[in-house]
C-alpha cells in the first residue's frame, strides 16, 4: 500500500492503548499522530501521562513520547481533524463508550474499537478478519443510519473468543456443530492488570470474570451470523455454554473445548487437516499483521502451553492441541491465543488493515 494513514489512539494510556502504541510504532500503513485519554492525562506528554504505568516489555515508542495527550471526550473535533481514523480502547461505562464512539463516527472519523459497547449494535460489524471479513459490507447501512459519509464503527470480539472460535469456524462450515461447552482460563492482562497492580492473583485462581460468560456464549453466534437487510443477524446454532476463570498468568488465554456435531462428524485426521489448511481474507490480502498460518496443531500431549505458544507468529496465531474423542461430546481439545495481541490490540490493528485494504478509509 503506497498511502500511509494518519491514526489516533483513544484510550492510549491503558494497557490495550499501550499495546496499540507498540504495535503501531513502525507500522507500514499507519502513522500515529494523535494520542487521547482521560482529562487526567490531557495536556501531558505521553511519557508523562503513562509514567510508571507503562507495562509493555519494550520501551515507550520514541516517536510518541513527546506527543501531547488530548482529552478523548472534549477534544473530539480537534482529534478528528488530524486523523484518518482512530483505534479506541477506553475505560468508561458502556453507555458512555457507545455515545463516544458514535460521536467520533459522526465527526466523519471511522472508529476501530477494542471495546464491547457496540458489539451488539445490529449494523456494527464485529470482525475477526480470517473468519467473517464479509461483515464489513454492513458499513454502508450503518453510515446511512448515522448520517455520515466516511464515519463508522467496527469492533473486534471479546479476547477469550479468539482462542477457541477460530478452531470452530472452519469445522462448522463443513460439519455443522450442534453444541459447544468451553471453559476458559484467562490471563490477568485481560483485566488490564499486572502482578504488581494485582498481587492478590499471585498463587490464586478466581472462578469468576464479570460478564465474560455471557459474551463467550453470545458473541460467537454474531461472528457466525449473516447480513440480512440493514443488520447482522446472529446464527441460531451451535448452542454455547461457557465457564470463565481468571488464572495467575500474565498473558495468554486458554480454552478447553468440548464439541458435538449435528449429524456426520469428521475424523480426527480431517479436523487437523481442516485446521492446518485454513486461511482467511487476512491471508489472501497478505495484511501486515496477519499470521502466515492462522491455526497450528500440536501433537505433543502437553501442548499448547502459555510460555512456548503465546507468541507464535508474533502473538497472532492460534494454537490447538489434545484433540481426542469424548465420552459425552464427540470431541474435546485445547486452544490458546495471546489475549492482548490476537485477542485485543493486535486483532484491532489487523481489522484496521482489512478496512484499509478494502477501501473503507478512503
Which functions belong to the PLM regions below?
Residues 189-362:
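Charged docking surfaces used in two-component/phosphorelay signaling
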Residues 2-201, 205-207, 239, 312, ...:
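N-terminal Rossmann-like NAD(P) cofactor-binding subdomain of oxidoreductases
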Amino acid at each position: 500500500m503506497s498511502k500511509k494513514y494518519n491514526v489516533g489512539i483513544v484510550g492510549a494510556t491503558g494497557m490495550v492503548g499501550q499495546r496499540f502504541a507498540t504495535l503501531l510504532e513502525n507500522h507500514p500503513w499507519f502513522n500515529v499522530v494523535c494520542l487521547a485519554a482521560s482529562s487526567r492525562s490531557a495536556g501531558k506528554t505521553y511519557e508523562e501521562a503513562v509514567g510508571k504505568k507503562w507495562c509493555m516489555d519494550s520501551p515507550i515508542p520514541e516517536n510518541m513520547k513527546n506527543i501531547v495527550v488530548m482529552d478523548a471526550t472534549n477534544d473530539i473535533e480537534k482529534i478528528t481533524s488530524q486523523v484518518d481514523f482512530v483505534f479506541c480502547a477506553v475505560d468508561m461505562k458502556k453507555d458512555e463508550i457507545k455515545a463516544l464512539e458514535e460521536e467520533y463516527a459522526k465527526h466523519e472519523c471511522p472508529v476501530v474499537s477494542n471495546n464491547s459497547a457496540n458489539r451488539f449494535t445490529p449494523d456494527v460489524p464485529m470482525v475477526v478478519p480470517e473468519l467473517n471479513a464479509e461483515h464489513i459490507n454492513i458499513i454502508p447501512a450503518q453510515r446511512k443510519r448515522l448520517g455520515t459519509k466516511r464515519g463508522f464503527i467496527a469492533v473486534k470480539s471479546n479476547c477469550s473468543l479468539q482462542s477457541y472460535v477460530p478452531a470452530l469456524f472452519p469445522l462448522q462450515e463443513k460439519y455443522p456443530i450442534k453444541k459447544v461447552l468451553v471453559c476458559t482460563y484467562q490471563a490477568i492482562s485481560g483485566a488490564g492488570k499486572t502482578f504488581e497492580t494485582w498481587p492478590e492473583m499471585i498463587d490464586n485462581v478466581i472462578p469468576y470474570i464479570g460478564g465474560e460468560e455471557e459474551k463467550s456464549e453470545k458473541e460467537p453466534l454474531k461472528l457466525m451470523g449473516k447480513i440480512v437487510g440493514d443488520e447482522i443477524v446472529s446464527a441460531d446454532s451451535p448452542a454455547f455454554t461457557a465457564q470463565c476463570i481468571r488464572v495467575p498468568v500474565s498473558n495468554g488465554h486458554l480454552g478447553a473445548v468440548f464439541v458435538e456435531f449435528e449429524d456426520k462428524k469428521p475424523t480426527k485426521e480431517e479436523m487437523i487437516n481442516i485446521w492446518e489448511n485454513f486461511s482467511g481474507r487476512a491471508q489472501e490480502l497478505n495484511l501486515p499483521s496477519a499470521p502466515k498460518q492462522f491455526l497450528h496443531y500440536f501433537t505433543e500431549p502437553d501442548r499448547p502451553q502459555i510460555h512456548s505458544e503465546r507468541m507464535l507468529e508474533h502473538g497472532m496465531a492460534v494454537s490447538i492441541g489434545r484433540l481426542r474423542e469424548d465420552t459425552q461430546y464427540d470431541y474435546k481439545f485445547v486452544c490458546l491465543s495471546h489475549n492482548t495481541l490476537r485477542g485485543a490490540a493486535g486483532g484491532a490493528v489487523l481489522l484496521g488493515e482489512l478496512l484499509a485494504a478494502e477501501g473503507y478509509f478512503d
